[in-house]
A protein has these predicted regions:
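N-terminal glycine-rich phosphate/pyrophosphate-binding loop and immediately adjacent elements
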Residues: 2-131
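Short, glycine/acidic-rich beta->alpha junctions
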Residues: 15, 159, 216, 220
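Generic, well-ordered alpha-helical scaffold segments in large soluble proteins
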Residues: 26, 169-170, 223
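Hydrophobic (often cysteine-bearing) scaffold residues that line and stabilize catalytic clefts
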Residues: 65, 163, 217-221
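A short mid-domain helix/strand-loop element embedded in enzyme catalytic domains
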Residues: 69, 194-198
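Rossmann-like flavin
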Residues: 98-195
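Helical element adjacent to the flavin cofactor pocket in flavoenzyme catalytic cores
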Residues: 200-223
Length: 223
């Protein structure tokens, strides 16, 4: 390899490829090093008996026009090279709890309305939850592209408060508590340890919209 690069990025996952692209777009000579035969990190996919399986990115959120991932992918020139397929907006995810199935719906009002059908006596609790996680994301500069001039970009309360602690404060309904935290396996969270901040960013991300990458997630890396 010629030794005339200004920047060497180690690892070809989504973060590595993104930073390499941004640096190259701004005039730097960049090389990306990957130890494995296939690049892409958790964007990789594999096939078994003709069926494609993603290793990490099974579906994406907030990718409709004006939403955060759409802005990122547009800047990274990814959108023209991938095809998106919308998940069911009335049920983009299902939480199974005690032999009952609960649907997560896209859109804040739709999310509240759908869960309220299962928890008619906890409508205000669900509204409070949706409002809270949306407020957290709106105050995150990485999510909203606002408040970059603020020295303290994280509200200590959102970082120190666990998901379980917060949700226990807004509702005493045990079933609802479990349903609202039912997406924890999506990001390997722990109810008593994972901060509200992390849960809010991920949950609101998918409530806004949810799509799968047609073909497989490695199309993002190939773009």
């Amino acid at each position: 390899m010629e030794n005339n690069y200004e920047v060497i990025v180690i690892g070809s996952g989504l973060s590595g490829l993104s930073i390499a692209y941004i640096l190259a777009k701004n005039g730097f000579k960049v090389a990306v090093l990957e130890k494995n035969a296939q690049f892409g990190g958790c964007l990789q996919s594999f096939k078994r008996e003709g069926v494609t399986f993603e290793t990490g990115m099974h579906y994406v959120g907030s990718i409709e026009e004006g939403q955060i991932l759409h802005k990122y992918f547009n800047y990274l020139s990814i959108l023209d090279d991938i095809e998106l397929s919308s998940l069911n907006k009335s049920c983009y995810d299902i939480i199974d709890f005690r032999e009952e199935r609960y649907s997560y719906a896209n859109g804040h009002e739709n999310f509240v309305e759908t869960l309220s059908q299962k928890f008619p006596y906890n409508v205000n609790d669900i509204k409070e939850y949706v409002k809270a996680i949306h407020n957290v994301t709106e105050n995150s500069p990485y999510y909203s592209f606002k408040n970059f001039d603020t020295l303290n970009i994280l509200d200590p309360a959102h970082v120190k408060t666990s998901i379980n602690e917060y949700i226990s404060q807004i509702t005493k309904n045990e079933a609802l508590q479990n349903v609202l935290t039912g997406n924890i396996p999506l990001y390997a969270g722990l109810k008593d340890k994972t901060p509200l901040y992390i849960h809010a960013l991920i949950s609101d991300f998918y409530i806004n919209s949810a799509y799968r990458i047609v073909g497989s997630s490695d199309n993002i890396a190939k773009s």
